[in-house]
């Protein structure tokens, strides 16, 4: 066994289905196993996935055990030279895993590697590579200095934006959304710390890998990450869990060295959480006022007919371009029509490879980027970040 893929799922069965469809292509020719740990979903995820993906090993928990604990359950049972911890709200292109394996095979000093995560508008997610949140780095993030001077090697350590995103780089923290790990390294440093319910466990694991003498890397390979579709990222609960993880990390690794900073860190983290909650609430109000639904579908005619039927009751105008990546290699970017009338482009995944779709989206330019939707004839579902049809 070369690779075991571990996915923790909670009430996202259609996003998980899309992820698994992409994995079927990405795992061709690789001796691999897929482990799905369901954290007591209420949307019938285990039965739905088992009927469509008999090759997957499914573990069903009777409660939401959190991300770290659920991953550990599968890691203990999984076999393979490598482990991939993967979020269910992702799309993995066809050659990504083979290239990760090739890199890790050639770098025995590598403990983990991450990739370039794209948002649904094709923009680069800064969480793809991060520095360790030392007290100073965390201060720069919380105070806004990191945002003011993003490319500064002093103030911008949190997101490492001074590094070239198109080149392989050594980094500190590999994101838990796509964390490609050497199994022997995990056996050496231990499993995910279950004190972290969700968020922060990837930082802690990356830190322990570095302390054990391994190196962590960023590879310029694209995946799509809807960024937490299974969580309400603007909710008070999300912000509490996210910022509490920062406190857990500080208390575990830095409090003994900087005891006087503890009350300052707690106050700063609490204040930042409140600011973010207010900011996210305002964003939600703005999104509710957005009614534009003009979409562009690119793919096969018979597939378009199926997709249009899904949208018939959703007040969505769906224009059609019959094409494939062979005759329209740059997708909507090759079209002469004005694209600013659309806010979403839907690609037929039978007519375009996942790799090609993400390549096209990554080359989007301008402020008004189109958001991505995908339609798979195999699932009969049209998937966007906001909704599944």
Predicted segments — roles?
Residues 91-127:
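Conserved donor NDP-sugar-binding/catalytic core segment of glycosyltransferases
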Residues 22, 38-47, 63:
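A conserved acidic beta->alpha catalytic loop
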Residues 12-27, 332-333:
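Short, well-formed alpha-helical segments that are part of the catalytic scaffolds
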Residues 207-282:
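Active-site-adjacent helix/loop segment of glycosyltransferases
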Residues 164-166, 172-222, 360-362:
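A short, conserved alpha-helix in the catalytic core of glycosyltransferases
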Residues 83:
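Short aromatic/hydrophobic "clamp" motif used to bind/position activated sugar donors
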Residues 132-171:
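Short, flexible, basic/aromatic active-site loop/helix in glycosyltransferases
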Residues 60-78, 99:
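Glycine-rich, basic loop-to-helix element that forms the pyrophosphate-binding segment
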């Amino acid at each position: 066994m070369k690779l075991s893929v571990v996915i923790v799922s909670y009430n996202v069965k259609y996003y998980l289905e899309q992820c698994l469809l992409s994995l079927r292509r990405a795992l061709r020719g690789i001796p691999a196993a897929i482990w799905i740990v369901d954290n007591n979903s209420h949307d019938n995820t285990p039965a739905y996935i088992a009927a469509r993906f008999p090759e997957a090993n499914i573990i069903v928990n009777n409660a939401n055990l959190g991300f770290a604990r659920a991953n550990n359950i599968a890691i203990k049972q999984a076999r393979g030279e490598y482990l991939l911890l993967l979020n269910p709200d992702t799309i993995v292109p066809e050659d990504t895993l083979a290239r990760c394996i090739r890199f890790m095979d050639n770098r025995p000093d590598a403990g983990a590697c991450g990739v370039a995560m794209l948002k649904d508008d094709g923009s680069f997610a800064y969480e793809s590579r991060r520095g360790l949140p030392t007290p100073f780095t965390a201060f720069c993030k919380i105070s806004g200095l990191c945002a003011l001077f993003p490319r500064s090697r002093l103030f911008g350590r949190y997101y490492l934006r001074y590094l070239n995103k198109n080149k392989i780089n050594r980094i500190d923290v590999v994101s838990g959304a796509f964390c490609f790990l050497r199994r022997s390294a995990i056996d050496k440093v231990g499993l995910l710390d279950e004190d972290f319910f969700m968020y922060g466990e990837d930082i802690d694991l990356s830190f322990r890998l570095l302390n054990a003498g391994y190196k962590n890397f960023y590879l310029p390979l694209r995946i799509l990450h809807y960024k937490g579709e299974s969580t309400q990222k603007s909710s008070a609960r999300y912000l509490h869990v996210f910022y509490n993880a920062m406190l857990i990390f500080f208390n575990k690794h830095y409090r003994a060295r900087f005891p006087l900073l503890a009350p300052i860190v707690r106050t700063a983290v609490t204040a930042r959480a409140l600011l973010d909650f207010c900011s996210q609430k305002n964003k939600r109000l703005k999104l509710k006022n957005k009614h534009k639904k003009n979409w562009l579908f690119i793919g096969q005619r018979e597939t378009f007919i199926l997709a249009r039927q899904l949208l018939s009751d959703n007040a969505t105008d769906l224009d059609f371009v019959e094409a494939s990546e062979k005759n329209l290699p740059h997708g909507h970017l090759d079209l002469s029509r004005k694209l600013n009338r659309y806010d979403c482009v839907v690609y037929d995944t039978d007519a375009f490879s996942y790799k090609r779709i993400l390549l096209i989206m990554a080359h989007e330019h301008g402020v008004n980027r189109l958001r991505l939707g995908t339609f798979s004839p195999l699932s009969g579902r049209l998937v966007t970040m906001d909704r599944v049809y």
